Amino acid sequence: MSKLGISSLFKTILLTAALAVSFTASAFTEGTDYMVLEKPIPNADKTLIKVFSYACPFCYKYDKAVTGPVSEKVKDIVAFTPFHLETKGEYGKQASEVFAVLINKDKAAGISLFDANSQFKKAKFAYYAAYHDKKERWSDGKDPAAFIKTGLDAAGMSQADFEAALKEPAVQETLEKWKASYDVAKIQGVPAYVVNGKYLIYTKSIKSIDAMADLIRELASK
């Protein structure tokens, strides 16, 4: 092949590569697939935050079929980080306290929040099942002790151990971080998935687990 032919071929390859990159970059669109938060969640680099509530039916559905598989596909680039929304549900505050304690227990034990042995996972699905499947309401806000007991029994933790753990600095720090949940949740409700604390995924635009994982990867690389 002549030098001219080689040069032409090389230019064609470069153009094809450039078009491929351009196509990939335009696969997702700000305003359609995601938005940039005006008020980013601090200290959230390399994370996939899920804002959720025990009282949210769609949070339950996503946790059963979407959150785990998606998180598994992107675990090499972002760490799954749940944020419980205290302002939703009669026992939002108590749920946040139970979840914060159990998440920190799992982390200390080196247990994934998706593992069958995760105390957080056990309590979370116990609340989901009780609230959404069994329609349990724990006296509509009048019996917080009964609500807390549901989660602790599922996790295998005593009330005394829970109360002691709740005072730990790491748990209080988690609860403080979760206060950012409200500003995110009021945009499109929950569940709300946020990448790197900056990019809120529009759940209505999610087409599949693979597409969601691709979007997360793209946003995480920004």
UniProtKB/Swiss-Prot annotation:
Q: What inducers act on this gene?
A: Expressed from a tri-cistronic operon that encodes AssT, DsbI and DsbL.
Is Signal found in the keyword set?
yes
Disulfide bridge map? C56-C59
Q: What is the effect of changing C56S?
A: Loss of activity
Its subcellular locations are: Periplasm
This entry carries the following GO cellular component terms, namely: periplasmic space
List UniProt keywords, sorted A-Z.
Disulfide bond, Periplasm, Redox-active center, Signal
Report the InterPro entries cross-referenced here.
Answer: DSBA-like_thioredoxin_dom, DsbA/DsbL, DsbL, Thiol_disulfide_DsbA, Thioredoxin-like_sf, Thioredoxin_domain
The positions making up the signal sequence are 1-27
Cross-referenced Pfam families, in alphabetical order? DSBA
Task: Enumerate the GO terms in the molecular function aspect.
Answer: protein-disulfide reductase activity
Indicate the segments forming the Thioredoxin domain, all copies.
28-221
Effect on the protein of changing C59S: Loss of activity
Q: Which HAMAP family match?
A: DsbL
Entry similarity comment: Belongs to the thioredoxin family. DsbL subfamily.
Subunit-structure text: Interacts with DsbI.
Q: Quote the PANTHER family the UniProt record gives.
A: THIOL:DISULFIDE INTERCHANGE PROTEIN DSBA (PTHR35891), THIOL:DISULFIDE INTERCHANGE PROTEIN DSBL (PTHR35891:SF3)
Role noted for this protein: Involved in disulfide-bond formation. Acts by transferring its disulfide bond to other proteins. Part of a redox system composed of DsbI and DsbL that mediates formation of an essential disulfide bond in AssT.
Protein name listed in UniProt: Thiol:disulfide interchange protein DsbL
**Annotated source species:** Escherichia coli O6:H1 (strain CFT073 / ATCC 700928 / UPEC)
